[in-house]
Swiss-Prot record:
InterPro entries found in the cross-reference section: QueC, Rossmann-like_a/b/a_fold
Gene expressing this chain: queC
SUPFAM superfamilies membership: Adenine nucleotide alpha hydrolases-like (SSF52402)
Family membership: Belongs to the QueC family.
Pathway named in the protein's UniProt entry: Purine metabolism; 7-cyano-7-deazaguanine biosynthesis
Originating organism: Paramagnetospirillum magneticum (strain ATCC 700264 / AMB-1)
UniProt: ATP binding residues: L8, S9, G10, G11, L12, D13, S14, A15, T16, V17, L18
Positions bound to Zn(2+): C191, C201, C204, C207
Catalytic reaction annotation: 7-carboxy-7-deazaguanine + NH4(+) + ATP = 7-cyano-7-deazaguanine + ADP + phosphate + H2O + H(+)
EC number from the UniProt entry: 6.3.4.20
Name of the protein this chain belongs to: 7-cyano-7-deazaguanine synthase
Cofactor: Zn(2+)
């Protein structure tokens, strides 16, 4: 099996992508980041997901993005909340972490070179998402082009591919795909502002998108919510 790198946050999307990479015949190594996020319970979720899917190589990289701040996920800025039936506001929300996907994909690129992998999987989505600019197809294409100019492996003839299997799927479709592949969503963590014991808030954009996805799929969300 070919090696691949999968960015694994511990959330619903990345767990699904990890299962997809396995189903497509890759031998995935998972890469998770401890970047100073307020929702650090996702690190434990990533460990659970990696174990459940039989991933032998799971690395956790420490990068402290709190030194820059500028996001509700890495500073004292309040996480926006709303009700399930409210539309998520247009524009880029304060939960956007400046350059996060670029930073993480760069780490994944370095990891791929070390492992001799030519494939990186990431769970970005441009349908049911919060409007982050680094989740768009054009961004992924641009990063892939850069990667194939910037690495020793590419210069020597090994073309790198960034896989985005969820990019055009609704959240409900993602959930259905994951369930078909045996993903246990009860062990994932999606919330941006969980309680200290790991319960989801149920009102941040991420929780609302997740809940709407399960409703679309006609299923109950197995996550534990504080309210």
């Amino acid at each position: 099996m070919k090696p691949a790198i999968v960015l694994l946050s511990g959330g619903l999307d990345s767990a699904t992508v990890l299962a997809i990479a396995k189903a497509e015949g890759f031998a995935p190594a998972a890469l998770t980041f401890r970047y100073g996020q307020r929702h650090a319970v996702e690190i434990r979720a990533a460990e659970r997901v990696a174990a459940a899917l039989g991933i032998r190589d799971h690395r956790i990289a420490d990068i402290d993005l709190r030194v820059f701040g500028g996001s509700a996920l890495t500073s004292d800025i309040a996480v926006p909340k709303g009700e399930l039936d409210e539309a998520i506001p247009a524009g880029i929300p304060v939960t956007y972490v400046p350059a996060r996907n670029t930073i993480m994909l760069s780490f994944a690129l370095a990891f791929a070179e070390v492992l001799g992998a030519a494939d990186i999987f990431v769970g970005v989505n441009a349908v049911d998402y919060s409007g982050y600019p680094d989740c768009r197809p054009d961004y992924i294409k641009a990063f892939e082009a850069m990667a194939n100019l910037a690495t020793k492996a590419a210069v020597e003839g090994t073309r790198l591919t960034i896989h985005t299997p969820l990019i055009d799927l609704t959240k409900g479709q993602i959930i259905r795909r994951g369930l078909d592949l045996g993903v246990d969503y009860s062990i994932t963590s999606t919330c941006y502002d969980p309680t200290p014991d790991g319960k989801a808030c149920g009102h941040c954009d991420s929780c609302r998108l997740r809940l709407k996805g399960f409703a679309e799929a006609g299923l109950a969300d197995p996550a534990e919510y504080a309210s």
